Amino acid sequence: MRRPPAPGAPRCLSWASSLFCSAASTLPGPLMAAKWFKEFPLTLKTASERARPGGAGGKPRKNSETGGAAPTPGKGRKNSAAELGASKASSGPPKDSRLSRDSLQGLIQAAAGKGRKNSRVTATATEEEPHRGAVTKSAGCSTYISRLIKVDTQEKNGKSAYPGGGSTSSSSSSSSSASSSPSSLGPELDKAKIMRQQDTVIILEDYADPYDAKRTKGQRDAERVGENDGYMEPYDAQQMITEIRRRGSKDPLVKALQLLDGPSEPGETVKVEATAKRRSSKDLLGKPPQLYDTPYEPSEGGQRVAEVKTRPADSRLPEEDDRPAAEYEQPWEWKREQIARALSVQFEGSDRPPGREDAGRPHHWQKTLKPTLSDHGDGEKVDPGLALEKQPWYHGSISRAEAESRLQPCKEAAYLVRNSESGNSKYSIALKTSQGCVHIIVAQTKDNKYTLNQTSAVFDSIPEVVHYYSNAKLPFKGAEHMTLLHPVHKLH
């Protein structure tokens, strides 16, 4: 029979409790207590092992547990422990030694800062010590071990429920993990698998994918459902173009391209070619083909040319324009003969007949230039035996301003001969240069001969002077490279 503790006595009920009280008073803090008690259970022996060598009359020990009387408050802790050991040796080993070890583990966890729940369980176990049996003690121990195993599993998954867990709990959980049953961990593993399956990565942008992301067909189809903003993959664009060509498009431009590329019936081709031939013959008789009426590259079939020519209103050239087609809106390498012919008509007075295209076009703008243009080409030969009054380039008595106005529309190196307005000379040659018009005075010597300057040759008549300098360079500074090339005819 165990006696109740005396009033005023301390709550240390066993040898382990008294030892814990002394250690708690000497150690600096809970951490040191936890470290000390971590190694303490390894050297701890059970009551039966301690009772074997000494027997009933053995040496009393410090860490013995009393079965009945509690120490008096007047004595020290060491003497009370000795008395408890003596009484334990006389009475034999107690029955609740394992219960005291469980209570010791609960006290260790309470000192290390465990949760309230563990402290509550430990306190309950301490209060119910006198009423528990051996079966109840073993059940409490296994329950506590399974709780430690659950804590270790949660820490392994990164979700620790006990933030202040010490090293003692981890060591005891690792030592008792072999005895744990896998049935207690099954529901938690199943929940973790279900949560992982629900966390599916959905990526909507191609360039935001991580390198290990796996895209499914459903995600790609979901991206294609959105509105088309003009940017798409090359494969998708090719598929869209193929679908438009197969079904047909409402776009008029696409329809026009399909009509141009598609085959036509033979009867329609013959009609179009006949219309094109009639139209082309009218164009040749009326006016030459323009730049926007005929494409630069010749077409292979007559259908495209006919479609272009059946729309004369789309041409950039107006129908009322009398200017030649070679004069504007055509490149230089195109219709080169027409351009050269038009230039020769304007400035050279070519004897070549106009082309077939220019026969039916009236050139009203050229009528004002024809009286002042020469009928000969470059390097016109001058007849020196013909009298001066019969030469076409002799204009008689005209002023300097009138001579310049007649040379204005002409090319460079155009010339005419007129009577000089100064009293020093009788005749003067008006010449057009790149800088403007110059007037060369023909000097007359005492023996009635003509020369341009003192170093030049002397001639008997003005036609001989013009004939000579139509093949030789003029002896004047600024005109060394020029000759009399283009005579300007006088007005009739």
From Swiss-Prot:
Biased composition regions of type Low complexity, renumbered to the chain: 168-184
SUPFAM superfamilies per UniProt: SH2 domain (SSF55550)
Residue span, SH2 domain: 393-488
Modified residues (Phosphoserine): 103
Composition-biased stretches (Basic and acidic residues): 149-158, 214-227, 268-285, 306-332, 349-361, 373-383
Keyword Nucleotide-binding: no
Annotated SMART domains: SH2 (SM00252)
Distribution of this protein across tissues and organs: Expressed in heart, brain, lung and skeletal muscle.
Protein known as: SH2 domain-containing adapter protein E
UniProt organism field: Mus musculus (Mouse)
Native organism taxonomy: Eukaryota, Metazoa, Chordata, Craniata, Vertebrata
